[in-house]
Amino acid sequence: MYNDEFELTFDLADAGPKKEQRRPTLPEPEEAVVAAPPVQETREMPVSAAPENTPASEPEREPEPAAEPQSTAPAVKDRTVLISGGDRGIGAAAARAFYAAGYRVAVFYHTNAEAAAALQKELPGVLAVQCDVASRASCELAFRAAEQALGRVDVLVSNAGIAQQKLFTDITPEEWQRMLDVNLTGAFNLCQLALPGMIRRKAGRILTVSSMWGQTVGSCDVHYSAAKAGLIGLTKARAQEVCPSGITVKCVAPGVIDTDMMASFTAEDNAALAEETPVGRLGTAEEVAKLLLYLAGEDAGYITGQVFGVNGGLVI
């Protein structure tokens, strides 16, 4: 078993002596609350008394409220999304976003059964299945359970991952292999299981969650950066291969996201991280989830093989 919680550091200086700063691991969020828009009433104004034989003036009316912008995508009907690492963090935020949009939702979790149960209570009808994505046998059992319970998988969000802060010279062969097994082979396993059905239907969406550290480099996490960079390569190559079958493959690369994984960081730590970020704040898991939801929809049907950074300008 592995521990999903680690503390990471990064150095963003472009010049001069580098100093190491602590950075958080990538996944993890707070629940987004979407309030319904307030209802606006149209009221008739009272009609003033008019002189005899003089027609009363027309009552004044308040202007009609502006119409809400409508998506060009058709309503979501009978679509299922499978999210690995969906019990908390970015995965849980994605589960909430897809659920609110009308998807059937299945989440895979590794060891945190309590968090998975809490998500099921919050979102009635969500399926939670235990799965170690690094194990092909575990993926096959979990994927079969999801298909039997909810039907075909229309959208796969490969989000499960681990991180570790360690000097390159101190990384053991076992730690190196485990990082690749979870962060890269895990995506390979789930994508191979999802693709046959998508190819038969000539439709499907595959979304991978990499990291800005797969686009650039971070200190003391060479194995993590290597695995996440490999995930970007896997996404692009697979996109080219399956596009003729009506399947699009896209990648989201989050930066420093404010989630429960940052609970050990002090207010000073968070302030320093925000100062390093060009937009002046940390990202939220809900922001990443909204992008995943958009990329899964019909409005994003012309997009494939691309990497979308959600990093506040840290990587440009």
Positions of the model-derived regions?
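Short, small/polar-rich loop/turn modules that mediate ligand/substrate recognition or access, typified
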Residues: 243, 248, 303-305
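Conserved glycine-rich cofactor-binding loop
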Residues: 87-88
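Substrate-binding pocket helix/loop in short-chain dehydrogenase/reductase
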Residues: 167-168, 175-180, 262, 269, ...
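Alpha-helical segment proximal to the catalytic Tyr-Lys
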Residues: 196, 240-241, 301
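C-terminal substrate-recognition "lid" of short-chain dehydrogenase/reductases
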Residues: 188, 199, 203, 281-310, ...
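Residue(s) in the substrate-gating loop at a strand-loop-helix junction
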Residues: 211
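Active-site helix of classical SDR
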Residues: 191, 227, 235
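Catalytic Tyr-X3-Lys loop
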Residues: 162, 169-188, 203, 207, ...
